[in-house]
């Protein structure tokens, strides 16, 4: 269990869910992880929901009105200056999907797309640094890029965030790439399997920590979700599983090995 007061640039700091049915999403994730939720009205209408555990912000949920866009989890990386990071992303071959903008007095953000098409949000925190708790049951614990171009994305992210790469033996792929900042691991990367349908884009996956992966898998099914990967051991790491929630948003859970 970890309380967070600040984030170093280049660290994943937040995740939020965009869904056409926020009421159902709140019910699903609250029952699954034990989240408490609070709706915060937005200036243009609607609400942004904060999910909390033990008094700390964990993640966000928001309604989505655009047609044809499936429910999805967005990943956020902390940066010192959103405007500069966005310019750097474009110079490295990325695209800007949403230019830098202020989010009230909470912070400043932008949404970019890497050279292989995976979307990622950049966050310059002000009043809101990001998640207040990480690594405990129901909170963020890992982020993983599944991509169709490992080489291009490895070069892109190392130059954008100052990450380093470390090749490791994979469980389902020959090589799993670990991104780190020279001291701490920051994220993982693996190629999308050849069996994956061509219409599945490169994407960042959000992992939530859980105390019991198998129990969570059963609970997901009872709440209307669908397993994509059953509970599976990762040597020296823990036990994980992947799911679609009832609205079709993809996410994963990890039961870390006891240290």
List each language-model region with its residue ranges.
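Short, low-complexity, polar/charged sequence segments that are solvent-exposed and flexible
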Residues: 34, 56, 79-80, 96, ...
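Core segments of cupin and vicinal oxygen chelate
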Residues: 7-9, 13-56, 91, 99-111, ...
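Vicinal oxygen chelate
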Residues: 1-8, 11-20, 49-52, 64-88, 90-141, 166-184, ...
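N-terminal beta-strand motif that seeds the catalytic metal site of vicinal oxygen chelate
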Residues: 1-26, 72-75, 123-155, 163-166, ...
């Amino acid at each position: 269990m970890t309380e967070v007061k600040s984030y170093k640039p280049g660290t994943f700091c937040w995740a939020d869910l965009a869904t056409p049915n926020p009421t159902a999403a709140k019910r699903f994730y609250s029952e699954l992880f034990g989240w408490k939720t609070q709706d915060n009205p937005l200036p243009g209408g609607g609400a942004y929901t904060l999910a909390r555990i033990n008094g700390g912000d964990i993640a966000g949920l928001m309604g989505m009105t655009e047609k044809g866009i499936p429910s999805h989890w967005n990943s956020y990386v902390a940066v010192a200056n959103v405007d500069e990071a966005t310019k750097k992303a474009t110079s490295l071959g990325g695209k800007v999907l949403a230019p830098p903008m202020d989010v009230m007095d909470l912070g400043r953000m932008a949404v970019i797309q890497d050279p292989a098409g995976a979307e990622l949000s950049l966050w310059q925190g002000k009043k809101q640094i990001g998640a207040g708790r990480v690594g405990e049951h129901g909170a963020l614990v890992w982020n993983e890029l599944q991509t169709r171009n490992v080489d291009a994305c490895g070069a892109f992210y190392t130059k954008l965030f100052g990450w380093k790469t470390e090749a490791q033996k994979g469980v389902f792929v020959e090589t799993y790439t670990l991104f780190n900042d020279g001291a701490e691991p920051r994220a993982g990367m693996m190629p999308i399997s050849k069996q994956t349908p061509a219409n599945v884009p490169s994407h960042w996956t959000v992992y939530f920590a859980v105390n019991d992966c198998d129990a969570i898998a059963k609970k997901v099914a009872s709440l209307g979700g669908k397993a994509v990967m059953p509970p599976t051991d990762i040597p020296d790491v823990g036990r994980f599983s992947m799911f679609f929630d009832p609205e079709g948003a993809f996410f994963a859970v990890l039961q870390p090995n006891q240290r």
